[in-house]
């Protein structure tokens, strides 16, 4: 019998595409949902029974009572943030009950220290006008600590606390040399970590072994990507990116799975484009359309609360992300946000000096200077948020979806028409 493969949900733009909602829908049929990269800089909103839950570090499947959730070795964990997230969501509704017995944390995952968050903010201030737009959650400094091999891992916290203390002091010393004004209450921090050690101990395990065991047992494993392709450290709009691998390759390094274990790759695409923070954004609209999308789409960051920049759907971005990730099906979200527009533009090419560019420019300067070629699609100017059948959509909305399929070469399987779990249309295969 062929071994079960994992399915993965990835963002194909600059994040905030609606990955959490698709994961939540798919988690109903999954046995396991796992995170493999990023930290609590991610923000996924899931609406269950009209209750809106915000997840940052917890996998979005945590709201399903029969679903195990895994935080893999590629994730960086801020333990105070984890427990704060649990408390906030538990106060909203009952869907996280029993979460401790279902959450598995990698012993190889790195710890985000409070000082990492302070350093993140200090580094951002140092940049002056060249700010990256970081969430200041300490993600970059934690991955930096990991790369220069003085990071603290969960297994360190599970071991001899005296050794953990020594390593912690070394990290403090390193950063205080770089940032003399950095203040760290060492005693308070160590006391807090002693408490967290006992809290998380029952959840900590070798998640690489665990995920392979799940697959051997033919469990249905769903992987939840954080951030998105255009925020990937290698393939995104560097340096305005995150510090981890948000693409399909991050699965192998962030969970310990071989490439042949990856089955379907579901790419999530917003029906228009948004990004938080600075960096190139060729289809950004600074006028009426951008303001409309921001207001109608409630485009504010889940993690930061910052206004998202808005613009037209960019198929150069989508096609680039589909190519890198081997996307097998697309989930097109927030189609209902376009309801009131008379004409809808889709970017189909970048040009420089009149010449069409074949790929995605690596240079931010080039990307900032490209001329964007659009196709115009007729709007439908009617409310589609209550529609649940593809054939019941206005013909113009159907045409928009089919155009995305045509331009990407990838079938659209789902359409999101609202924030609720039920506000999803299954798209029939193209005849």
UniProtKB/Swiss-Prot annotation:
HAMAP family: Adenylosucc_synth (MF_00011)
Record-listed substrate binding positions: 302-308
Any one GO cellular component localisation term in the record: cytoplasm
Pfam family, one: Adenylsucc_synt
Binding-site residues for GTP, renumbered to this chain: 15-21, 43-45, 308, 334-336, 416-418
SMART domains linked: Adenylsucc_synt (SM00788)
Protein family according to the UniProt entry: Belongs to the adenylosuccinate synthetase family.
Catalytic activity: IMP + L-aspartate + GTP = N(6)-(1,2-dicarboxyethyl)-AMP + GDP + phosphate + 2 H(+)
Molecular function per GO: adenylosuccinate synthase activity; GTP binding; magnesium ion binding
UniProt-recorded name of the protein: Adenylosuccinate synthetase
Localization: Cytoplasm
GO biological process terms on file: 'de novo' AMP biosynthetic process; IMP metabolic process
């Amino acid at each position: 019998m062929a071994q079960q493969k994992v399915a993965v949900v990835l963002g194909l733009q600059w994040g905030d595409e609606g990955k959490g909602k698709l994961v939540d829908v798919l988690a109903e049929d999954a046995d396991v949902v796992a995170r493999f990269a990023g930290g609590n800089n991610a923000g996924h909103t899931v609406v269950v029974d009209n209750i809106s839950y915000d997840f940052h570090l917890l996998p979005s499947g945590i709201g399903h009572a029969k679903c195990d959730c895994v935080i893999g070795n590629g994730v960086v964990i801020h333990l105070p943030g984890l427990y704060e997230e649990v408390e906030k969501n538990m106060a909203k509704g009952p869907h996280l009950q029993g979460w401790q017995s279902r959450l598995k944390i990698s012993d190889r995952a790195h710890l985000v220290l409070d000082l990492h968050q302070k350093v993140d903010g200090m580094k951002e201030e140092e940049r002056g006008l060249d700010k990256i737009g970081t969430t200041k959650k300490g993600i970059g400094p934690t991955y930096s600590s990991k790369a220069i091999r003085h990071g603290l891992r969960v297994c360190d916290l599970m071991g001899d606390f005296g050794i953990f203390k020594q390593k912690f002091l070394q990290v403090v010393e390193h950063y205080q040399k770089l940032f003399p004004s950095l203040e760290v209450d060492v005693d308070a921090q160590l006391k807090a970590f002693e408490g967290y050690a006992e809290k998380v101990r029952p959840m900590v395990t070798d998640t690489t072994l665990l995920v392979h065991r799940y697959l051997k047992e033919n469990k249905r494993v769903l992987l939840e990507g954080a951030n998105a392709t255009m925020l990937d450290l290698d393939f995104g709009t560097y340096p305005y990116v995150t510090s981890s691998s948000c693409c399909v390759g991050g699965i192998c390094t962030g969970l310990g799975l071989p490439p042949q274990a990856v089955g379907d790759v579901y790419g999530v695409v917003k029906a228009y484009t948004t990004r938080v923070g600075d960096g190139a954004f060729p289809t950004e609209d600074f006028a009426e359309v951008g303001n409309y999308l921001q207001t109608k789409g409630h485009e504010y960051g889940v993690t930061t609360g910052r206004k998202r920049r808005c613009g037209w759907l960019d198929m150069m971005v989508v096609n680039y992300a589909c190519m890198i990730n081997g996307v097998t099906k697309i989930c097109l979200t927030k189609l209902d946000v376009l309801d009131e527009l008379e004409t809808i533009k889709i970017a189909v090419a970048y040009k420089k000096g009149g010449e069409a560019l074949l790929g995605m420019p690596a240079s931010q300067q080039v990307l900032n200077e490209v001329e964007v070629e659009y196709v115009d699609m007729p709007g439908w100017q009617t409310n589609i948020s209550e529609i649940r059948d593809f054939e019941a959509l206005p013909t113009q909305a159907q045409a928009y979806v089919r155009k995305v399929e045509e331009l990407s070469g990838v079938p659209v399987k789902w359409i999101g028409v609202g924030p609720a779990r039920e506000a999803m249309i299954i798209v029939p295969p193209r005849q």
